[in-house]
């Protein structure tokens, strides 16, 4: 891709060690897009998706077969879907996430995210809060380790009660090729609305796993969560501040 596009400002390492200017990063994006298009031809994957979307029942093996059909990593296929779904299916309410998981430290890190149309609920936090363990993006790590699988795939419908948003989330986990104790997960979330129900027939399949989820434990209002990692201290603080503000307002009204 770099050669065909005649880019002289480019990156020579993966992962990136450093970049000297924005043009190198931009050219890397263009080259990656071009290479992905060559590896995953548009017409072929569009036809495959139409077949999958036309079925009344969700079948995980259909998606796993799609992800392994090309000479490309699951991440490349998921990235290609962020191009294909908006352009050919008019499905634009999407997010793309890449997590890493360190088995030694039990740490999760969100190191790549893309939001189309708007910033959706699952997004990075900069305050070391605990990401929701109900996300399929994180659950596939444990499944991958337990099953010793090279490619672990799963899907669920994630419901965000506080935002009144629902997403069909597809996720894949693989081992990091450079570090034995590190794993990666790639996921794509598709916003569920009336239009999606017309395009994806299996979206109402009762067999698809469904979970109420939050963003981080510290901001989550879900009660009795079996995988909560921390109390909802941010939410508790906001509620306490609101109670104080309401009490002050009542006093002002009473004595004014």
Where are each of the predicted segments found?
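Conserved binding/catalytic microenvironments
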Residues: 1-256
């Amino acid at each position: 891709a770099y050669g065909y596009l005649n880019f002289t400002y480019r990156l020579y390492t993966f992962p990136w060690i450093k970049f000297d200017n924005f043009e190198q990063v931009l050219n890397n994006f263009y080259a990656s897009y071009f290479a992905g298009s060559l590896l995953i031809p548009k017409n072929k994957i569009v036809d495959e998706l139409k077949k999958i979307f036309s079925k009344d029942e969700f079948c995980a093996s259909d998606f796993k077969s799609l992800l392994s059909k090309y000479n490309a990593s699951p991440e490349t296929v998921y990235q290609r879907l962020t191009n294909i779904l908006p352009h050919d299916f008019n499905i634009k309410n999407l997010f793309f996430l890449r997590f890493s998981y360190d088995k030694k430290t039990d740490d999760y890190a969100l190191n790549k995210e893309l939001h189309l149309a708007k910033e959706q609920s699952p997004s990075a936090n900069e305050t070391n809060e605990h990401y929701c363990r109900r996300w399929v993006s994180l659950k596939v790590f444990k499944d991958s380790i337990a099953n010793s699988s090279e490619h672990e795939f799963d899907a669920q419908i994630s419901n965000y009660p506080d935002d009144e948003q629902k997403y069909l989330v597809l996720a894949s986990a693989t081992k990091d090729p450079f570090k034995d104790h590190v794993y990666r997960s790639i996921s794509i979330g598709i916003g569920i609305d009336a239009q999606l129900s017309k395009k994806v027939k299996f979206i109402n399949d009762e067999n698809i796993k469904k979970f109420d989820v939050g963003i981080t434990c510290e901001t989550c209002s879900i009660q009795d969560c079996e995988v909560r990692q921390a109390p909802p201290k941010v939410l508790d603080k906001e509620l306490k501040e609101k109670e104080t503000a309401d009490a002050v307002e009542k006093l002002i009204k009473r004595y004014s």
